[in-house]
Amino acid sequence: MNNSILNKLKSLRNRYQEIEIMLTQKNVISNRENLKTLSKEYLKLSEIIKYFIEWEKLEVDIENVNILLNDVEIQGMAEEELYFFNKKKKALEKKINQLLLPEDPNDKHSCFIEIRSATGGDESSIFAGELFRMYLRYAESYSWKVEIMNTSESEKGGFKEIIAKITGRGACGRLKFESGGHRVQRVPETESQGRIHTSTCTVAVMPVTPKTEKEEINSSDLKIDTFRSSGAGGQHVNTTDSAIRITHIPTGNVVECQDERSQHKNKAKALSILSARVYAAKLEKDRQESSSMRKILLGTGERSDRNRTYNFPQNRITDHRINLSIYKLDEVLQGKLDLLIDPIIQEYQADMLSSLSKSES
């Protein structure tokens, strides 16, 4: 463990001991709000301090065993013990490092996921549909609920655009790395020469903000239009003006919802998506101050962000952000997305830990 992290832990232990004393004082106990705040901080610190105390004890044990290595009679036993202690120490340091990382308050929330076809025409729309089904299966593996908010279907199948709300604890934290450009390489069914075509889709992931954090949107900043909902190819599926188009005038953001028969429900859905977009834009502005690696990993949902290539002939999927290729494309499309998300999270946490070390040094 480097000195900067060690100093950080010692500082946290001092704070922990300080709060421990404060929680016995009458003036603190009598102030309900202050007591609640301090108790919450104490509880949060208690876990990391518990591991730190265990780590310090291990350091002493390792030091003692190293002395025993000089004794020929018990050298073999000492080496076994040293191996066990070092393995335990490594696991403890990993746990401590994870606990030291600052929490993203949005990670525990639900999210909206917006998939749009980009370049490649019908093939891009078909791929957008496949991406949605991949996320649907992934959500099912975590028992998250998926609600389709709005769709714009393509004549040849798939979607020009699909927006879904994924409800479940931790959905945003795991899916936030999906924002950006997704490229598919394969031979389309309509290709008679057997040539591989390249198409792209964009994905944007936005946290579903709780009521207390919802971005306030002035009604004067909104332009609301109603129109008749229609299916693929422009066929009318509703004879009333139940579809809603809301334009956020300051940003030019436009949201359409037409999947519900009720105009009121479509409006509620559109406003919730718009609120998430405005909030996500605010987060993106704040994120510009973060390290370049974190900006690359998180993406912005723009097509210029090249996240992955899905190569069907090779059954290969490549994540360009961390230079990772795996030959399990079929499994990933069936929802085994953690094969890619876990390595991304590890890279992200490593970058955050590196930044933490620099700030403490």
Curated annotation (Swiss-Prot):
It holds the Pfam family PCRF. It comes from the Bacteria. Coiled coil: none annotated. One of its GO terms (cellular component) is cytoplasm. The modification N5-methylglutamine is found at residue 235. It is found in: Cytoplasm. Keywords: Cytoplasm, Methylation, Protein biosynthesis. GO terms for molecular function: translation release factor activity, codon specific. Methylated by PrmC. Methylation increases the termination efficiency of RF1. SUPFAM superfamilies: Release factor (SSF75620). Peptide chain release factor 1 directs the termination of translation in response to the peptide chain termination codons UAG and UAA. Belongs to the prokaryotic/mitochondrial release factor family. This is Peptide chain release factor 1. It comes from Buchnera aphidicola subsp. Acyrthosiphon pisum (strain APS) (Acyrthosiphon pisum symbiotic bacterium).
